[in-house]
Amino acid sequence: MRRALRLLPLPLSIAICLPAMAADKPFNWGLCPTVDPLPGFDGAPAADPKAAEMRQQLPTDIEGDQLSGTSTTPQYQGNVALKRGDQFLGADNLRMDTETGNYIAEGNVRYQDTSFRMVADRAEGNQDTDTHKVTNIRYQLVERRGNGDAESVDLQGQVGQMHRSTYTTCDPSQPIWRVRAPEIDVDNGEGFGTARNAVLQIGNVPVLYFPWFKFPIDDRRQTGLLFPQFGLSRRNGFDYLQPIYLNLAPNYDATLLPRYMSKRGFMFGTEFRYLYEGGRGEVTGNYLPNDKLRDKDRGSVFYSGYHNVNSNWQARSSISWVSDTRYVEDFTSRLNGMGSTSSLQSTVGIYGTGETWTAGLMAERWQLTDYTLDERSLPYNRQPRAYFNWEKPFGIFEAGVYAEAVRFTHDDSYFVQPPSPSVPGEANNRDNNDKYVRTNIRNQEYGSGSRLDLKPYVSMPLSGAAWFFTPTLAWRYTAYQLDSTLAKTGPLTGDRSPSRSLPIASVDAGLYFDRETSLLGTNYLNTLEPRMYYLYVPYRDQDDLPVFDTRPFTFSYGQLFRDTRYTGADRQNDANQLTLAVTSRWLRQDDGREKLSLSAGQILYFSDSRVTINNSTNAVAGSEQTIDQGKSAWVVDANYMINDRWSMGATYQWNPNSRKEDLASLRTRYLLDNDGIINLAYRYRRNLIDNSDQLKQADFSFLYPINPSWSAVGRYYYSLQDRKPLEIIGGVQWDSCCLAVRGLVRRFVRNRDGQMDNSIQIEFVLKGLSSFGQNTDRTLRRAILGYYRDDLYLVPPSNTTTNPDDYDPNLIP
């Protein structure tokens, strides 16, 4: 009797055809009624994915109140139920003819399995010819909440036709939106459906009409149109993007990205993806012929991919190219200098990791993307770069070596002529009609050079239950081979083969105390963790060494325990200093959560530190404050969880020498119901060279649920120093069981000149179907920390872990 269930998978695939267009993102169904549109049937087996996988091997049980007819023409009457695994078919009457293969199921026909439910008035067909007809259908997709109806379904083998069907994820009694199609042809063998004259309705109003479209009904990808994206901005005008998906093969595909901008013209783009065992990649290209605003062709190419050579080695590449220095500003909407950079990085390399070692060979190149700057602002290219790191314990000792060899090159720079003032003596008026001119006058000719950096070390990490003591001795040798152009560039002395060699000694020690205590009726574990770090590095004159990739670290609590002030190998500071620091934590004993943490520390300098990065040949390296005998700024970090909703944090640096604060950062966060959040932050940094204010900003952002359906979003990011906003976002969100609408108005700084731009973003999300408009999630997730609540619990990358693509010989365990 298993044969009688042969029709069941076919109506299932027909009804699922429209929901196969659903978006990949999870949706919030919390506003939906608790009762399913089509509740489960009495007597049906419980949902069981394992039973669904085994259904073809399980027997079919048939039962009913009465059985009549003959052995070849059985007739079941009253509460007929057919069960196999997770499948259930119920009807009032079932007549079968085992010789001809005909069957008829009438009266309250019901079908259910793990993921699908359906009711119909009648089902009839022939098992031998595999033809079936089901009339007056209502269905529900259990996991997606998708539901709808159809007047009838005709099936012939793997091919079927659905007549006068609908689909929605809304409650059937109040469908805010639904898709109607008078006819849908489905080919289960090929995995696609074809709808004719389909209409998307919002309420009873048709908003989109599709005379013909083809779509997948299973996981197999199909060529076709994706939902469009559109927006409006002062920079590009009306902006419309229509993605066209091309399913080229099971392991690679492409998406055409034609884009129309009313102020610029048509841009042609494409995205190609490939996947194979051991690797994958993606390349995106865009081309805009004769930009109407810039009067020239524009374009970009981006590629990223990797290949696993074996279990230890992986090849990776990331390549970026744009046609001109205005491209990033014109075709992206991030904050220049805040959400994006003034340059693009391209890297190609192979990287290895073993139990005690990491290694890599790579090449890196930079491209300028800020039209207000010249090539002097670019970092040096590393072409190529090889590194090897090794560390291993030997009894109570640990030994290791950090090694790097790099060839540095740099593009020559040319003067950029800024716009002229409109009135003599007036500040530059840099509106959209002003033009920066890249001249042919060479500003600086850069040479090239190679660097070898070796840093072997041995340490003796000792520890107990309440203490640790780790002395470390390292030797650092750095040698260069420079071309004549670079060697003769001041302040270098002309030596083409300078070198530096010096020892580095340190002792890191700490204690751990804890006690059980109680405060306001809550039990805590209170810790006290004093720490001492002594560092000695003798002075070496390094004025004849170039500066390629070295910058001063930003002074922070972590900097108190490093053996150098610099990120790279071009400088190694001399030091005779002692760090004294302490941390105290209050941990709730019932759940282990940290109620309060306080950390404070200071460096005592026993002598002047004579090595600096000042007056280097590299403009990007910047400058730093000299360090004299005495004390560093106090560094204090604090985090306080007022309650489970409200938390505060602060970082403060006070300099006893200038009797001023070097840095202050205050932040607070309050979690609201329904995933709401309020963030408030203040940031201040002082320029340690001229004692001026370097940065002074306030940042306020929120996601405020007005009620379960409506919420307001916003951000006000303001520079107190410049007395102007950096970004303003205001918007509303409306959410329901099956539809979400988001609208944003955004004003933001778009370039280094401080010019502002405006944009309007609107997105419609038809839950369980798709979304169209601009991707507002990306904007809000960047602007409002906690817009996705899970983002609050992501662990930031540690600055003490080894990144295979970021050699740093200054990090010694």
UniProtKB/Swiss-Prot annotation:
InterPro entries: LipoPS_assembly_LptD (IPR020889), LptD (IPR050218), LptD_C (IPR007543), OstA-like_N (IPR005653). One of its GO terms (cellular component) is transporter complex. It is found in: Cell outer membrane. Pfam families: LptD, LptD_N. Residues 1-22 form the signal peptide. Gene3D superfamilies: Lipopolysaccharide (LPS) transport protein A like domain. Keywords: Cell outer membrane, Membrane, Signal. Its main location: membrane. GO terms for biological process: Gram-negative-bacterium-type cell outer membrane assembly; lipopolysaccharide transport. The keyword Membrane applies. The keyword Secreted does not apply. Belongs to the LptD family. Component of the lipopolysaccharide transport and assembly complex. Interacts with LptE and LptA. Together with LptE, is involved in the assembly of lipopolysaccharide (LPS) at the surface of the outer membrane. This is LPS-assembly protein LptD. The gene is lptD.
